[in-house]
Amino acid sequence: MYRTGLRRRLSAMHFFDVPGPEGEAHPHPYLVELLVAGDELDARGYLIDLDAMAAALESAIGLLEGKVLNELPQFSGTPPSVENLARTIWKMAVGRLPPVEWASVTVWEGDDAWASYGAWIDG
């Protein structure tokens, strides 16, 4: 199976319903990776056009950039954890991608802390 990925940066804020620093809105400089996979390449030898992939990811990230995640409808009733952020970006980006078999989004909250969400795409 072929895999193609790209990364973009996202700055956003969040808070949790807990006492202490995590309970106050605080920023994160996230690194977001979109990865797609499939068995077939097109006539150009591409799994996916990187420009189309970048447009899908940048469109999703653009809706979150500089925002307090808790205040967005995508996180209504959902804690803005890095896990839920990965799933939210996945849902927002996959609908804008050309047909692919599988996709995942990984969100890094620091150099060594990350969460990922991925799934097969129904065609």
Model regions: which residues?
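Charge-rich, low-complexity N-terminal segments
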Residues: M1-G123
